[in-house]
Amino acid sequence: KDIKPSDIMTREAFQNAIVTASAIGASTNAPPHIIAIAKHLNIKLTLDDWEKWGEEIPLLVNLQPAGDHLGEGFFQAGGVPVVMKELSKQNKINNGAMTVTGKTVADNLANIKKTENEIIKNYEAPMKDKAGFLVLRSNFFDTAIMKMSVVSEEFKKRYLSDSEHPMQFTARAIVFDGPEHYHNEINNPELNIDENCVLIIRGCGPIGYPGSAEVVNMQPPDHLLKKGISALP
C-alpha cells in the first residue's frame, strides 16, 4: 500500500497524542519532543495546541507520581488502548486517524474493553479534572509548561487561586547558574528565599546544556520544607 510515516503522523494523529498524553499524566518531556517530531514532518504544532486540546482533559490513570500504582499495573489493566477507548467514547480523539497497524484508531479500539479496576478510571470519574499541561507565559520566558496532574491542591491554592487573577502569580525570582550553583546556594540565608519566590536555573535548556538533561530536582530551602512548603514555582 506504500504507507509512509507521513501518512500516519498527521495533524490529527498529533492531536490524539496530545489528548492521550494529557489523560495518562505524561512527562513534561512530551510536549517539546512531540512538537519537534511534528516539525520534521512540516506540521505546525505549538504549545498553543497543547493548551487547546489537552488542558481540559482529566487524568484517567492512577499511577505514580500522581497516584499510587506502577507501570506494570497499568499494562495489566489494559494500558494506553483502554485509555484511548475512554477518550474515544467522549469524542476527544480522532477515530478516523490512520495508525501503524494500517487500520484506523476506531478499528484498533473496536474490541477493547475496560474491566473494573482502580488504575484506569472512567472519564466521568477521573483521578483529577483538568489535568493536562498548563501553558505559562511570563515576563522572563516566552513559554513554559506545568504538569497539572501532579500539582497539589496546596500549591494550586497558594499560587494559582488569586480571585482577581486566577491561574496567575507574581513572585521574586531566585536565579541559579546551573545545578551546582543551586545545590551550593539553595540554603544560603542571604538569598532570603520565602514562599513568594520562584526558583530558576539558567542555561540548562536544549541550547545551554548538553542534551537538555534533567539536571536537578529543585526543592525549596530546608527552612521552608520544615514549615511544610514542599514546592516552589
PLM ranges: what are they?
Residues 1-233:
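Catalytic or ion-coupling anion/metal-binding cores of large enzyme and transporter domains
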